[in-house]
Amino acid sequence: MLALILTISICIFLKGSTCSYINLGSEGIVFGAPNCPVDIPLTCTNSTPIDNSCCFESPGGILLSTQFWDYYPPIGGNESFTLHGLWPDNCDGTYEQFCDDSLNIRSATDIVLNQFGDKVLYGKMSEFWKNFNGNDESLWIHEFNKHATCVKTIRPTCYDNQRYVKNKNVYDFYNITMNLYEKLPTFQFLAAEGIVPSLTQKYSKKQINDALTKYFGKAVYFKCNKYKALQEVWYYHYLQGSLKEENFSPIDTIINSNCPEENIQFIPKNGFNPGPQPPKSPRKGYLESPGKKGCLISNGLWYEAGTCATYAISQQEFGGYKIRSSKGYCGMNSQGQFTCNKQVDPTKNQFQYNKDTRKIGYGGNFAWCLDTEHKHGDGKTAQTPIKISDGQCDSFPVQYGGK
């Protein structure tokens, strides 16, 4: 009877909702869902704090379904964008990453296929959730450890203790991510408006924007590579209730496309070969701030009196950049300070690097501040940690100066 009552209340709520899509479990309820109020607001729209973190996703209230079109080397089917992930971004566009090591996993296949026996889900993941290097499993693990550990509403504590089994949150994340991807067939959206892969035909930004907006209902972010070719598409959503309820509400993208206004390529898979490419070597240079005295030394601290350290910046396997000095890889410590030493794991510290401005960012934020409360020494010889700005300090950019 309880299940029936809960089912009815959810269905009534859905009929009055603006949500475009939702999946319910076979019993008519979402497994292990908490007793969430039916009138809980969409994420990022609340005027007062929501205490129940099992019913309201925060701070990652923007959910992005991200898809890639990898044409060289060709990844995935010729008529499908591949799934990259489901990301919880903060309402201001910044984001957390690798939030809880205790939730990390080492295998996705064991959980989806062996523990839960879901051959259908595993088959879909294998076909559409592809890694450019051929190791799909490593991408699935990375996406969970980096992003899903930051999703508060699918923490194990948000499940009914009597019905929760180990790794149910992992299985749910993969299943929900795939469900949302299947509702966003980017290739078909574009093809329906005459935008198809071609080595000769080129398209305008307006054509692509109008096509995606028509079928998603809101403005969509799309990204081009250095060849002015379409490569990524991101769909932004707010969420109502727990992620387990899959009550996504489309919203406009909060960032602008980098694609040119005209002559955008949509290159067929197997239809492009750039020729021999020189090996990529790490960029090397100083980390400093234009007009600001000082720079970063090898331990990651800001110093005014000495010689700047040389930092190497290179791309990570799954996106983002890793930074290294003579002391070791660099990352953000438990106090939120930039630090470099041999204990830092670069795979858990993905920085951003804007090639045009040469600015370094972390978690979507490119503003840094001096943590003067924890400086070492005084005067010109003081060594001061830097941290990502919280909006309450005198911020400055950290810029890479190539040698």
Swiss-Prot record:
**Which residue ranges are recorded for the region named Disordered?**
268-288
Signal peptide (residue range): 1-19
Q: What is its main location?
A: other
The highest taxon in the source lineage is: Eukaryota
Query: Could you tell me which Pfam families the record lists for this protein?
Result: Ribonuclease_T2, RNaseT2L_C
Q: Which reaction does it catalyse?
A: a ribonucleotidyl-ribonucleotide-RNA + H2O = a 3'-end 3'-phospho-ribonucleotide-RNA + a 5'-end dephospho-ribonucleoside-RNA + H(+)
Please list the residues that make up the active site.
Answer: 84, 143, 147
User: EC number(s) in its UniProt entry?
Assistant: 4.6.1.19
| Cystine residue pairs | 36-55, 44-91, 54-158, 99-150, 224-259
Where it sits in the cell: the answer is: Vacuole lumen; Cytoplasm
* Cellular component GO terms held in the UniProt record: cytosol; extracellular region; fungal-type vacuole; vacuolar lumen
Matching entries from CDD domains are given as: RNase_T2_euk (cd01061)
Coiled-coil annotated residue ranges, if any: none
State the Gene Ontology terms under molecular function: ribonuclease T2 activity; RNA binding
The glycosylation sites are 78, 175
For this UniProt record, the keywords arranged alphabetically read as follows: Cytoplasm, Disulfide bond, Endonuclease, Glycoprotein, Hydrolase, Lyase, Nuclease, Signal, Vacuole
Biological process (GO) annotations held by this record are: apoptotic process; cell morphogenesis; mRNA catabolic process
Give the record's family classification: Belongs to the RNase T2 family.
Function comment: Rnase which modulates cell survival under stress conditions. Released from the vacuole to the cytoplasm during stress to promote tRNA and rRNA cleavage and to activate separately a downstream pathway that promotes cell death. Involved in cell size, vacuolar morphology and growth at high temperatures and high salt concentration.
Q: Please state what the protein is called.
A: Ribonuclease T2-like
